[in-house]
From Swiss-Prot:
Self-association state and partner proteins as the record states: Heterodimer of LeuC and LeuD.
One GO CC term on file: 3-isopropylmalate dehydratase complex
Similarity remark: Belongs to the LeuD family. LeuD type 1 subfamily.
Pathway: Amino-acid biosynthesis; L-leucine biosynthesis; L-leucine from 3-methyl-2-oxobutanoate: step 2/4
Superkingdom of source: Bacteria
Matches recorded under PANTHER family: 3-ISOPROPYLMALATE DEHYDRATASE SMALL SUBUNIT, 3-ISOPROPYLMALATE DEHYDRATASE SMALL SUBUNIT 2-RELATED-RELATED
Function noted in UniProt: Catalyzes the isomerization between 2-isopropylmalate and 3-isopropylmalate, via the formation of 2-isopropylmaleate.
Identification of the protein by name: 3-isopropylmalate dehydratase small subunit
Length: 200
């Protein structure tokens, strides 16, 4: 995986609190165990008027022409609550979302997002309010997220955010759990060479 340093992208504002993982990716789409192909089912029950996903809901914000191609999702508090399904960040990433900005995220969803190389940015409610106002008032509004400096820039204003150093290291260097393990491949091989043959 390539690391995340900085990203500038179009923002889609999802002005709803407590969005759970069942809304992000409904349970009927959880049959697969790889990460590809879930984007078309993202927010299925909100994006579409039919079960087959062929009739877009014109009232849902992500279907608006001005937000097509958005890579930054702006949301309200407690985003990603509910069950711990990793399919939720898979669907967001497959749709093209690289950054999520909200006042808070559910803990498991927050960790799963980082494992899937998406950056969940926590700002204060008032800061999120300001960005909502900027995005809704300006078609094509973009924000820049700088993970190295831990800054969000929107409407020529900067907002600082915090992320623990270990998770920041993983994102900057494109490391998931497997990548972290492979960093110690030489030590693992050295240990395995010392294991008595009858234990192998």
């Amino acid at each position: 995986m390539s690391g995340f340093k900085q990203h500038t992208g179009l923002v889609v504002p999802l002005d709803t609190a407590n969005i759970d993982t069942d809304a992000i990716i409904p349970k009927q789409f959880l049959q697969k165990v790889n990460r590809i192909g879930f984007g078309k089912h993202l927010f299925h029950d909100w994006r579409f008027l039919d079960d087959a996903g062929e009739q877009p809901n014109p009232e849902f914000v992500m279907n608006a022409p001005r937000y097509q191609g958005a890579t930054v999702l702006l949301a309200r508090e407690n985003f990603g609550c509910g069950s711990s399904r990793e399919h939720a960040p898979w669907s967001l990433a497959d749709y093209g979302i690289q950054v999520m900005i909200a006042p808070s995220f559910a803990d498991i969803f927050y960790g799963n997002s980082i494992n899937n190389q998406m950056v969940p940015v926590r700002l204060t409610e008032s800061e999120v309010d300001e960005i909502f106002q900027f995005v809704e008032a300006n078609e094509g509004a973009e924000v820049t997220v700088d993970l190295e400096a831990m800054l969000v820039t929107a409407n020529n204003k900067q907002y600082s955010f915090e992320i623990d150093e270990f998770r920041r290291h993983c994102l900057l260097n494109g490391l998931d759990n497997i990548g972290l393990t492979l960093q110690h491949a030489d030590k693992i091989s050295e240990y395995e060479a010392k294991i008595p043959s009858f234990l192998k």
